[in-house]
Amino acid sequence: MRHKHGYRKLGRVSEHRQALLRNLACDLIENGRIETTVPKAKELRKYVEKLITKSKNADLNTHRYVYSKLGSNERAKAATRKVIEEIAPKFENRKGGYTRIIKTRFRRGDAAEMCIIEFVGE
């Protein structure tokens, strides 16, 4: 039984899963919306919404926390700056639910259910 397991493994080992979520989070922050599979989007939603909630309090510790969660490269640095300076202030009066998942189609080839994940209000 998988009661209270807490997260999806997505068919990957932990390091690969962490890298996948970091890359998807950077893509979502940079572009505002991305298309991916439903299980990945549901995991990404939890990951990104925690970052945005933490980013509402913009201090040095927040910058370091978000940067560490998004990786340590130039892309993560730009994404950190964008989430703290642009995205988090838009959701200042919102207590959660910063993203929306819209189911779109079934992928040709493996029939995986695809969806679009985007920020609310964009």
From Swiss-Prot:
Pfam families per UniProt: Ribosomal_L17 (PF01196)
Keywords noted in UniProt: Ribonucleoprotein, Ribosomal protein
GO molecular-function terms, A-Z: structural constituent of ribosome
GO cellular component: cytosolic large ribosomal subunit
PROSITE patterns: RIBOSOMAL_L17 (PS01167)
InterPro entries, per database record: Ribosomal_bL17, Ribosomal_bL17_CS, Ribosomal_bL17_sf
GO annotation, biological process: translation
Disulphide bridges, residue numbers: none
SUPFAM superfamilies: Prokaryotic ribosomal protein L17
Domain of life (superkingdom): Bacteria
UniProt subunit comment: Part of the 50S ribosomal subunit. Contacts protein L32.
Family: Belongs to the bacterial ribosomal protein bL17 family.
PANTHER family the record matches: LARGE RIBOSOMAL SUBUNIT PROTEIN BL17M, RIBOSOMAL PROTEIN L17
Name by which UniProt lists this protein: Large ribosomal subunit protein bL17
Species annotation: Nautilia profundicola (strain ATCC BAA-1463 / DSM 18972 / AmH)
Gene that produces this protein: rplQ
